Amino acid sequence: MHCAENCIFCKIIAGDIPSAKVYEDEHVLAFLDISQVTKGHTLVIPKTHIENVYEFTDELAKQYFHAVPKIARAIRDEFEPIGLNTLNNNGEKAGQSVFHYHMHIIPRYGKGDGFGAVWKTHADDYKPEDLQNISSSIAKRLASS
């Protein structure tokens, strides 16, 4: 397991900073966000220090994403939210403030629960052939990796 010296999440993994632990295995740690957006708002982190989604190895992704649905189901079953958001930000411009990959699991309880994710769509800006060109360029990149 690789950790970064000044990373707050690595310090939580090491036990240097306390947390309200929800789940732990050899590769993953989940704990309550200290700034609860809603009751049960949980952060899920890999124990290996990676900054963003681009740094996942196939093996680490398998281990990490094996745990996420289990944690989400436990939150659902315990608190019976009407829905659930999973969210992560990659890069400062995308809103990432802690540069250790993490996913927020945010239970939703209805209007006024404190969470709002709003974005503007641009469906009118893209013709069907534009979408085909974009999808083709991504598919080619995937095929070459």
From Swiss-Prot:
PROSITE patterns: HIT_1, HIT_2. It comes from the Bacteria. A motif (Histidine triad motif) lies at residues 100-104. This is Protein hit. InterPro entries: HINT (IPR039384), Histidine_triad_CS (IPR019808), Histidine_triad_HIT (IPR001310), HIT-like (IPR011146), HIT-like_sf (IPR036265). CDD domains: HINT_subgroup. Gene3D superfamilies: HIT-like (3.30.428.10). Signal peptide: none annotated. GO terms for biological process: nucleotide metabolic process. GO terms for molecular function: catalytic activity. The gene is hit. Residues 8-116 form the HIT domain.
